[in-house]
Amino acid sequence: MHLSPQEKDKLLIFSAALLAERRLNRGLKLNYPESIAFLSFQVLEGARDGKSVSQLMSEGTTWLSKSQVMEGIPEMVHEVQIEAVFPDGTKLVTIHNPIN
């Protein structure tokens, strides 16, 4: 199987996000890489589901709360940017202050 660098990145995000989701379900708090992967995956899947950039930017601030991440993580994550494929092309989605 031959994958482009972008496809490899998406698979890595998926793997890390799956791990993060499982840890959340077990009641564990996410660390920095898990938090970023979880948020990034939500954007990628939302784009795949047909949501708009503005919709994802708005929803992105509700996906994780301070109680779901380790201490200090909300202060480290000021924004998350990820390129996602939408029906009308690839767009950059930026979520400001995603962990409330």
UniProtKB/Swiss-Prot annotation:
Task: Name a single GO biological process.
Answer: urea catabolic process
Q: Gene3D superfamilies under this entry?
A: Urease, gamma-like subunit
Q: In which pathway does it act?
A: Nitrogen metabolism; urea degradation; CO(2) and NH(3) from urea (urease route): step 1/1
Q: According to the UniProt entry, what is the EC number of this protein?
A: 3.5.1.5
Q: What class of enzyme is it?
A: hydrolase
Sections of the chain in a coiled coil:
none
Primary localization class, coarse: cytoplasm
Swiss-Prot/TrEMBL catalytic activity: urea + 2 H2O + H(+) = hydrogencarbonate + 2 NH4(+)
Q: Where in the cell is it found?
A: Cytoplasm
Chain segments annotated as transmembrane: none
- Has UniProt tagged this entry with the keyword Aminoacyl-tRNA synthetase? no
UniProt KW keywords = Cytoplasm, Hydrolase
GO molecular function terms attached to this record: nickel cation binding; urease activity
Q: Which GO terms describe its cellular component?
A: cytoplasm
Against InterPro entries, the record matches this protein to:
Urease_gamma, Urease_gamma/gamma-beta_su, Urease_gamma_sf, Urease_subunit
Subunit structure as annotated in this protein's UniProt entry: Heterotrimer of UreA (gamma), UreB (beta) and UreC (alpha) subunits. Three heterotrimers associate to form the active enzyme.
Q: Which family does it belong to?
A: Belongs to the urease gamma subunit family.
Q: What is the name attached to this protein's record?
A: Urease subunit gamma
